[in-house]
Amino acid sequence: MRISLTKTAKPSKKAILWGIAYLIFYQFLFSYVLGFLENFLPEPLDIIEVNLIFSLTNVTAVVLIFRKYLLQTLREARYRIPAILGYALLAVLGTMYLSELVSNLVWQLNPDYYNVNDVGIDLMLLENRPMVILMTVILAPITEELLFRGLIFRSLFDRSKVLAYVVSMCLFSFIHLTNYIGYLDIQWLGLAFLEYLPAAYCLAFAYHNSGSILSPMLVHALVNMISIGLF
């Protein structure tokens, strides 16, 4: 059964402001702060350690910022289990189908294209599989769904459903590319942007229709499990 999102839990204005501030810090400043602090360590951190610190700090900060919203979501969830699970399943299937269509289009536009993020994750999997699973299947879905669906999508939805979809989808896709701006050409970045849109749409769809942020969290976790070969 479809749930009206306007009648469900919503982050407070204070949480929204803190969330926006942290989103900016998380994306544009955190890596520099971490790099500065690393100078005081006796040995440099390896890539797994850096990403784990990044992931744990992000999930802790975001959960603290949105703790009241999360608690209200959990209280509402017991009445929405069928919707949470049902729309999560639809969104996973939709993500796989739409991603395949977009990937085929991308490869037709550039047969040499490959997703740089996926390559990085594959390399980390070879180094420390359990830690990568923790980061991609548990930590990333919580952090990213609270920020992009809970913060961006939900705060815009009451004003405009279309705006909520467009802004959350574009930001979600853009955020996954920022580390490569200046290193990859504009065509490559554009193709990568397109690749993230199906998932961004389906995650917003799951939240919109289930009325619970738990649904896109579940979708995100399952899609990441599939992408790293756990299914």
What are the residue ranges of the model-derived segments?
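Interfacial transmembrane-helix boundary/kink motif in multi-pass membrane proteins
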Residues: R2-F25, I47, Y69-E100, D158-L163
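Alpha-helical transmembrane segments in multi-pass membrane proteins
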Residues: W18-Y69, N115-L123, M131
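Alpha-helical transmembrane segments of multi-pass integral membrane proteins
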Residues: Y22, Y26, V50-F54, Y87, ...
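Alpha-helical transmembrane segments of multipass membrane proteins
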Residues: Y22, Y26-F30, L34, F54-V62, ...
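Juxtamembrane helix-loop-helix connectors linking adjacent transmembrane helices
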Residues: N39-L45, L71-A140
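Alpha-helical transmembrane segments and their lipid-water interface positions
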Residues: A61-V62, S103, W107, F231
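Structural signal for the C-terminal ends of transmembrane alpha-helices
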Residues: V63-T73, A206-N209
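Transmembrane helix-loop-helix hairpins at the membrane interface
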Residues: E100, E127-F231
